[in-house]
C-alpha cells in the first residue's frame, strides 16, 4: 500500500482506525515486564546452579550440569537485555504514532470537506458555485499534502525504530549431552502411528455444515472464515458465537485466543476483560487475575496499578455505579469499558451485556452501533450478523434486509448474490426466486435481463349518447352595496437618476404547431332564451382635488431596435367547410337614458406641457412578397331582411353653459424638409383603353374673399318621386386609357365667413325607394395610373361662432335588398409592391403653455330609444378557399432615443358627481342551431424573433404630495330573473385509443430511484440499499436516511450514519428513539432508550456536553 497516492480519507481513516496506541503501550509494558522476569530468571538460575556446584552437589556431574546450564543462563540474560530494548523501541513507536495522529487531518474535517463539495456541486445549476468549489478543492489538496507529509515522517521514524531492533537468538532446543533419539521426539511419533490415528492434512476442509456460511469447514450458521463452530463468527477456528478474531472459545470476544464472553483483547480467560492475558472478570490491562482490576499483573479484586496483590475498592474505575467496574462512568457490574449500562461490557457506551464493541444496544456484540445480539459487524439491527448495516439475522454480507444473505444489499432470504430482491438468488440484481443469472424478473432464470413486464393502458371504443341540458331558471338577485373607505396616499419622491443599463430581450423561437383535423358535432340546438334585466344604481362620486405641482423630471426614452422579422410562408388548409346556419332573431328593448348634468366649475390649473423631441426615424426599404395566391371560392347567398328603424327624436333644449377657453400659446413649429423615397415601384397593371386629350390648367389665384353676416330664408323642397329604374343586363364598357394629367400650383387665399344662421330644414313626407335588384356581373379590368401631386400649403384660417337649428328626419323604409352570387374569375395575382427606404427627420416641438380655465356645466335631458327588432339572418353553407402567402421578411428598424423635458402636472378640482339609476330591460333571443364546422389539419412553420436591443436610459425623479380619496359607496346592483336556454348535444363517437404503455425492465428491486442499484422497494439516494423507502447509501430496513457522503445504517426510520434500531436521529446511534447532537459526520456514540446527547448509554439520559 503506497500511502503517497492515497487520498486523505484513507490515510486519516487508517491512522484513526483500530485500537490506537493502547495495544502498543500494553506491548511495551509486557516487554518491560518480560525483561524484568528474564533478568530475574537468569539471576535466579545462575544463583541456583552456582549454589549447587559450590554446595550440596559436588563432583563431575555437578561440573557437567554447570557447563550445560551456563549457555542457558547466558541466553536468559541476553534475552532480558533485548526485551528491555524492545520495550524502549515500543515506547518510541508510541511517540511516533502520537505525533502522526496529531499531524494528520481529522477524518471528520475531510468528510465535512467532501460533503460541502457535494452540496456545492449539486446546487451549482448556473455555475454560481465555481469559486467556492475551487476553494474547497484547494483545501482538499492541502489536506492531501498534509497527510502525505505526516505519513512520510511516520514511515521514516517507524523504519528507524524497526531497524534498531535486533532479532532474538534462538533458544536452546535440547539440553547439552541429551541423546539424539530422545531429543528428536521419535518415540512420540511412533506411539501415534501405533495407535492408528491418521495424520490430518494441512488446511481446513472446504465444506460447511449449516446455512449462509462463507469460507470452509464451518459448523453452524452465518460464519465467515475457516473451521468455526457456532454462529456468526468472523475469523478462523472459533468455538462459540459472535466472535471477531481467531481461536476464541466462547462468544462475543474481539481478539484472538480468548476463552469466555465479551473479551476485548487476546489470550484472556473470563468475561468482559479489556486487554491481554487477563484471567477473571472485567479486568483492564495485562496479566491481571481476579475481578475489576485496572493495571498490569495484579492479583485480586478492584486493584488499581501494577504488580499488586489484594483487594482494593469495589470499583477500580471512577464514576461508576455498581460493582467490580474497572472502566469509568459505568452503571452495572464487571464493565471494563467506559460509560456502559449493563454487565460485562468491555467496549464503551453500550447498553446491555458482554459487548466488546462500542455503542451497542443488546448483548454479546463484538461490532459497534448494533441493536441486537451477537453481531460482529457494525450498525446491524438484528442478531448474529457478521456483516454490517443489516436488518435481520445471520447475514454474513452487508446492507441486507432479511436473513441468511451472504451477498450484499439484498432484500429477502438466502441470497448469495448482490442487490437481489427475493429468495435463493445466486446471481446479481434479480427479482424473484432461484435466479442464477443477472437482472431477471421471475423464477429459475439463468440468462440476463429476462422476464421484464409490459403494460399498456387502452380506452375502449365508446359512443356517447346525445346530451340534453334543460333550461335552468335563475331567480332575480341584487348585489350588495359596496363602500370603499377613504384612502390616503402619503407624499413620495422617487430617487433621482435611476439608471437602467442597456439590455437585450432574448430571441424567441416559436416551434411548429400542429392542429389536427376537427369536426364539430352537427345540429347543436340552442333554445330561445332571454338575457335578464339589469339595474345599475345611482353612483355618487364625491368631490376630489388632485395634488398641485406634481413634478416630473426630464428624462429620455431609450433607443429601441426592432430586429428583422422572418415570417415563413404559410398555406391555410383547403376546403374548410361551414354548414348553413341562421342567426337568431334579436330584440333590443327600449333604453331609457336619464337626464344628466355635469358639475359646474371644474377648474384646471395652469400648466405647461414639456418640450418634446422626436428623433429622426429611419424606415428601411420593404418589399411585399410576390405572388400571394388566393384560391377560388364562392361566398354563400346572404339574405338581409327588411329593417324597420323607428322614428327618433333628440331631446330639445340641450344647454351648454357659457365658458371661456384659456389662453393658448402655440409656439413656432419647425417641420423640416421631407423627401419621399425614390423608386417607389408598383407592379404594372392595365386599365381598359380610354382616350382623353391632354388638359392644361393654368395657374389660378383666388384673392381674399370676405362674406359678411347673412340669413338664409326658409327653403321648401316639394315631394320628389324617383320612378322605378331598370338597368338591362349585359352592359359592356370597352377598354380605355387615362393619359397623364398635370396641374399647376394652386394658391387659395384666406377666406373669412361671418356669423350666419341656418333655418330649420325638414320634410314631413316619407321618402320611399323602390326595390333595387342587382344581377350577377363580372368586371374584368387592368388598372394603370401615374400621378404627381405638388406641395400643398393651406393658409391659416378661422371659424366664428355659428348655431344650427333642429334637424328633423321623417320615417322611411328600406326595402329588401337581394345580392345574387357573383364570381371572380381566378387566379387573381397581386404583383410585388416595393417601397424603398425613406427618412423622417427629427421634429422639435417646444413647450406649450396653457392658462387655467373652467369647464362649463353641460345638461342633457332624458333620452329614450324605442324598441328595435332584428329578424333572423340566414347564411347558406360555404367553403373557405385555400390561401397561400410567400415568406415575408421585415428589415431591421431602429428608433432613436426620445427626449422629454421636465414639467409639472396642474391641480385639478372636480365637484361631486351623481349619476342617476339606469335600467336595462331583458333582451330576448329566439332559438337557433349551430352549424357543423370541419377543419383539416393545420401545421404552422416555426417562427423566430431575434433579440431586441435597448440602450441604457435614466428614469426621472417624480415627486407627489399626499393624496386623500373620499369614501365611495356603490349602491346595490339588481339582476332580474332569467332562464338559461336548453342545449342539445348530439351523440359523440370516441374510438379505442392507447393512452400509454410502460414496462418494468429486468433489474434490482421495484420503484427504486437511487443512483447506484438498490434492491427492495421505493429506495432512493446514492444506492446500494435494501428494504423499503430508504434514502441514502448502504442502508437496510424501512424508511432510513443518511446524509450525503455517509455510509451505512439499518433499522426503522433512523436518520444519520452508522445507526441501527428504531427512530434514532444522529450518527453512531443504536437502540430506540435516541438523538445524537453532534454533526452527522461525527459519531455521537449513543445507545439505549430515549437518550439525547453524546457518549450515552441506558435510559432517558440527557446532556449536551
Curated annotation (Swiss-Prot):
The lineage of its organism: Bacteria, Bacillati, Actinomycetota, Actinomycetes, Mycobacteriales. Transmembrane segments: none annotated. This is Uncharacterized PPE family protein PPE24. It comes from Mycobacterium tuberculosis (strain CDC 1551 / Oshkosh). InterPro entries: Mycobac_pentapep, PPE_dom, PPE_sf. The gene is PPE24. Pfam families: Pentapeptide_2 (PF01469), PPE (PF00823). SUPFAM superfamilies: PE/PPE dimer-like. It comes from the Bacteria. One of its GO terms (biological process) is response to host immune response. Belongs to the mycobacterial PPE family.
Amino acid at each position: 500500500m503506497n500511502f503517497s497516492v492515497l487520498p486523505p480519507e484513507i490515510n486519516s481513516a487508517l491512522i484513526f482506525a483500530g485500537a490506537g496506541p493502547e495495544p502498543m503501550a500494553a506491548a511495551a509494558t509486557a516487554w518491560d515486564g518480560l525483561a524484568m522476569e528474564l533478568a530475574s530468571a537468569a539471576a535466579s538460575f545462575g544463583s541456583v546452579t552456582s549454589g549447587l556446584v559450590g554446595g550440596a552437589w559436588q563432583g563431575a556431574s555437578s561440573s557437567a550440569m554447570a557447563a550445560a546450564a551456563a549457555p542457558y543462563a547466558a541466553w536468559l540474560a541476553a534475552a532480558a537485555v533485548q526485551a528491555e530494548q524492545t520495550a524502549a523501541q515500543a515506547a518510541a513507536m508510541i511517540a511516533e504514532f502520537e505525533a502522526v495522529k496529531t499531524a494528520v487531518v481529522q477524518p471528520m474535517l475531510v468528510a465535512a470537506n467532501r460533503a460541502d463539495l457535494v452540496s456545492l456541486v449539486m446546487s451549482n445549476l448556473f455555475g454560481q458555485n465555481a469559486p467556492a468549489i475551487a476553494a474547497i478543492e484547494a483545501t482538499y489538496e492541502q489536506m492531501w499534502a498534509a497527510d502525505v507529509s505526516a505519513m512520510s515522517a511516520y514511515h521514516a521514524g517507524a523504519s528507524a525504530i524497526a531497524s534498531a531492533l535486533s532479532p532474538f537468538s534462538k533458544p536452546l532446543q535440547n539440553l547439552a549431552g541429551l541423546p539424539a533419539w530422545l531429543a528428536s521426539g521419535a518415540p512420540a511419533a511412533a506411539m501415534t502411528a501405533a495407535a492408528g490415528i491418521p495424520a490430518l492434512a494441512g488446511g481446513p476442509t472446504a465444506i460447511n455444515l449449516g446455512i449462509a456460511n462463507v469460507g470452509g469447514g464451518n459448523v453452524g450458521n452465518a460464519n465467515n472464515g475457516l473451521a468455526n463452530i457456532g454462529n456468526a463468527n468472523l475469523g478462523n477456528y472459533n468455538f462459540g458465537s459472535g466472535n471477531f478474531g481467531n481461536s476464541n472459545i466462547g462468544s462475543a470476544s474481539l481478539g484472538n485466543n480468548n476463552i469466555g464472553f465479551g473479551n476485548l483483547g487476546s489470550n484472556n480467560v473470563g468475561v468482559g476483560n479489556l486487554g491481554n492475558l487477563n484471567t477473571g472478570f472485567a479486568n483492564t490491562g495485562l496479566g491481571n487475575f481476579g475481578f475489576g482490576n485496572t493495571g498490569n499483573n495484579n492479583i485480586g479484586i478492584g486493584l488499581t496499578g501494577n504488580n499488586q496483590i489484594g483487594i482494593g475498592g469495589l470499583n477500580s474505575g471512577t464514576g461508576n455505579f455498581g460493582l467490580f467496574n474497572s472502566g469509568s462512568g459505568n452503571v452495572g457490574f464487571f464493565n471494563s469499558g467506559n460509560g456502559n449500562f449493563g454487565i460485562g461490557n468491555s467496549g464503551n457506551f453500550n447498553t446491555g451485556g458482554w459487548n466488546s464493541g462500542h455503542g451497542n444496544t443488546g448483548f454479546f456484540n463484538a461490532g459497534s452501533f448494533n441493536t441486537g445480539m451477537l453481531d460482529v459487524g457494525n450498525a446491524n439491527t438484528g442478531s448474529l450478523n457478521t456483516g454490517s448495516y443489516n436488518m435481520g439475522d445471520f447475514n454474513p454480507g452487508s446492507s441486507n434486509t432479511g436473513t441468511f444473505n451472504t451477498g450484499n444489499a439484498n432484500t429477502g432470504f438466502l441470497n448469495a448474490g448482490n442487490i437481489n430482491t427475493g429468495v435463493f438468488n445466486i446471481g446479481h440484481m434479480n427479482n424473484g426466486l432461484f435466479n442464477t443469472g443477472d437482472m431477471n424478473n421471475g423464477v429459475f432464470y439463468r440468462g440476463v435481463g429476462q422476464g421484464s413486464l409490459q403494460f399498456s393502458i387502452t380506452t375502449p371504443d365508446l359512443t356517447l349518447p346525445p346530451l340534453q341540458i334543460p333550461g335552468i331558471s335563475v331567480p332575480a338577485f341584487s348585489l350588495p352595496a359596496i363602500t370603499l373607505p377613504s384612502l390616503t396616499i402619503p407624499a413620495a419622491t422617487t430617487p433621482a437618476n435611476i439608471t437602467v443599463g442597456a439590455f437585450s430581450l432574448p430571441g424567441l423561437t416559436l416551434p411548429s404547431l400542429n392542429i389536427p383535423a376537427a369536426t364539430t358535432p352537427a345540429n347543436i340546438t340552442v333554445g330561445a332564451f332571454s338575457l335578464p334585466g339589469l339595474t345599475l344604481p345611482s353612483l355618487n362620486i364625491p368631490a376630489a382635488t388632485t395634488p398641485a405641482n406634481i413634478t416630473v423630471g426630464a428624462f429620455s426614452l431609450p433607443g429601441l431596435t426592432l430586429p428583422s422579422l422572418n415570417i415563413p410562408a404559410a398555406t391555410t388548409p383547403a376546403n374548410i367547410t361551414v354548414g348553413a346556419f341562421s342567426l337568431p332573431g334579436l330584440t333590443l328593448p327600449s333604453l331609457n337614458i336619464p337626464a344628466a348634468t355635469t358639475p359646474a366649475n371644474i377648474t384646471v390649473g395652469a400648466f405647461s406641457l414639456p418640450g418634446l423631441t422626436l428623433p429622426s426615424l429611419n424606415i428601411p426599404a420593404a418589399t411585399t412578397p410576390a405572388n400571394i395566391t388566393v384560391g377560388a371560392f364562392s361566398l354563400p347567398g346572404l339574405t338581409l331582411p327588411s329593417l324597420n328603424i323607428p322614428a327618433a327624436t333628440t331631446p330639445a333644449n340641450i344647454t351648454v353653459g357659457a365658458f371661456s377657453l384659456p389662453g393658448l400659446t402655440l409656439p413656432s413649429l419647425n417641420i423640416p424638409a421631407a423627401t419621399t423615397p425614390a423608386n417607389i415601384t408598383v407592379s404594372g397593371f392595365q386599365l381598359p383603353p380610354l382616350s382623353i386629350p391632354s388638359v392644361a390648367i393654368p395657374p389660378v389665384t383666388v384673392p381674399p374673399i370676405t362674406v359678411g353676416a347673412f340669413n338664409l330664408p326658409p327653403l321648401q323642397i316639394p315631394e320628389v318621386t324617383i320612378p322605378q329604374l331598370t338597368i338591362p343586363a349585359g352592359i359592356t364598357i370597352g377598354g380605355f386609357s387615362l393619359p397623364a394629367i398635370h396641374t399647376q400650383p394652386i394658391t387659395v387665399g384666406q377666406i373669412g365667413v361671418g356669423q350666419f344662421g341656418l333655418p330649420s330644414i325638414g320634410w314631413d313626407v316619407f321618402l320611399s325607394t323602390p326595390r333595387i335588384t342587382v344581377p350577377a356581373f363580372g368586371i374584368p379590368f387592368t388598372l394603370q395610373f401615374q400621378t404627381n401631386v405638388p406641395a400643398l400649403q393651406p393658409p391659416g384660417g378661422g371659424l366664428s361662432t355659428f348655431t344650427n337649428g333642429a334637424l328633423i328626419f321623417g320615417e322611411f323604409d328600406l326595402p329588401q335588398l337581394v345580392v345574387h352570387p357573383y364570381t371572380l374569375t381566378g387566379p387573381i395575382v397581386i404583383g410585388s409592391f416595393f417601397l424603398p427606404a425613406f427618412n423622417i427627420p427629427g421634429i422639435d416641438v417646444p413647450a406649450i403653455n396653457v392658462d387655467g380655465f373652467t369647464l362649463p356645466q353641460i345638461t342633457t335631458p332624458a333620452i329614450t330609444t324605442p324598441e328595435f327588432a332584428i329578424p333572423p339572418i340566414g347564411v347558406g353553407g360555404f367553403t373557405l378557399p385555400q390561401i397561400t402567402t410567400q415568406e415575408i421578411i421585415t428589415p431591421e428598424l431602429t428608433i432613436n432615443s426620445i427626449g422629454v423635458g421636465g414639467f409639472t402636472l396642474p391641480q385639478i378640482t372636480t365637484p361631486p358627481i351623481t349619476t342617476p339609476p339606469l335600467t336595462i330591460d331583458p333582451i330576448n333571443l329566439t332559438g337557433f342551431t349551430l352549424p357543423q364546422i370541419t377543419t383539416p389539419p393545420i401545421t404552422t412553420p416555426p417562427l423566430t424573433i431575434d433579440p431586441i436591443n435597448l440602450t441604457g436610459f435614466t428614469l426621472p425623479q417624480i415627486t407627489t404630495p399626499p393624496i386623500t380619496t373620499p369614501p365611495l359607496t356603490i349602491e346595490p346592483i339588481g339582476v332580474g330573473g332569467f332562464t338559461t336556454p336548453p342545449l342539445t348535444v348530439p351523440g359523440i363517437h370516441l374510438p379505442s385509443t392507447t393512452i400509454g404503455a410502460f414496462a418494468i425492465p429486468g433489474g434490482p428491486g421495484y420503484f427504486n430511484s437511487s443512483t447506484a442499484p438498490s434492491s427492495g422497494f421505493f429506495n432512493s439516494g446514492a444506492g446500494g440499499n435494501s428494504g423499503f423507502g430508504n434514502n441514502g447509501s448502504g442502508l437496510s430496513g424501512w424508511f432510513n436516511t443518511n446524509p450525503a457522503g455517509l455510509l451505512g445504517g439499518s433499522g426503522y426510520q433512523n436518520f444519520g450514519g452508522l445507526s441501527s434500531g428504531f427512530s434514532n436521529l444522529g450518527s453512531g446511534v443504536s437502540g430506540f428513539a435516541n438523538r445524537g447532537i453532534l454533526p452527522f459526520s461525527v459519531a455521537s456514540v449513543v445507545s439505549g432508550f430515549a437518550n439525547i446527547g453524546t457518549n450515552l448509554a441506558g435510559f432517558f439520559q440527557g446532556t449536551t456536553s
